[in-house]
């Protein structure tokens, strides 16, 4: 099956999480007017007994064509990825309770200046780079195991 890759924007991505970007977002000045602060762009969630982690993930490019055959989710916290070197990247997401609901399966491509924050329990493809090795600032939770993985029928990404 083919899965069309759509441009990433907050309106079409909102059911799955937050788009982290400055374009068309409100800000206020800090540090004597030298800094524009784009405040509270994503809601980070972790359970009380856990803690929030900030990491850097170095992702390798996926082999072409990109084929999706499994999704994962994190029921105990959100997970955010922001590319650090301006590279576009692809995210694949689906809603669903115990298993991914394939009628909600979507793929998006960022513009290289956007990150994503997956809501708790949103099914998504494991992180990968699109065209070149990419470092991602990653914000997620530390604590016990927090990853459910499900196989899905194979889908090949289709770039418009």
From Swiss-Prot:
Please state what class of enzyme this protein is. Answer: lyase
Instruction: Say which family it is in.
Output: Belongs to the ureidoglycolate lyase family.
Pathway of action = Nitrogen metabolism; (S)-allantoin degradation
Enumerate the transmembrane spans: none
Lyase found in the keyword field: yes
Quickly give the catalysed reaction: (S)-ureidoglycolate = urea + glyoxylate
Gene3D superfamilies from the entry? Ureidoglycolate hydrolase (2.60.120.480)
Which Pfam family, any one, appears in the UniProt record? Ureidogly_lyase
GO MF annotations, alphabetized? ureidoglycolate hydrolase activity; ureidoglycolate lyase activity
Name any Gene Ontology BP term: purine nucleobase catabolic process
PANTHER family the record matches: UREIDOGLYCOLATE HYDROLASE, UREIDOGLYCOLATE LYASE
Per UniProt, the keywords (alphabetical) are: Lyase, Purine metabolism
Which co-factors does it depend on? Ni(2+)
Enzyme Commission number(s) of this protein: 4.3.2.3
Give the quaternary structure.
Homodimer.
Q: What's its job?
A: Catalyzes the catabolism of the allantoin degradation intermediate (S)-ureidoglycolate, generating urea and glyoxylate. Involved in the utilization of allantoin as nitrogen source.
Q: Which InterPro entries match?
A: RmlC_Cupin_sf, UAH_cupin, Ureidogly_lyase, Ureidogly_lyase_bac, Ureidoglycolate_lyase_dom_sf
Q: What is this protein called?
A: Ureidoglycolate lyase
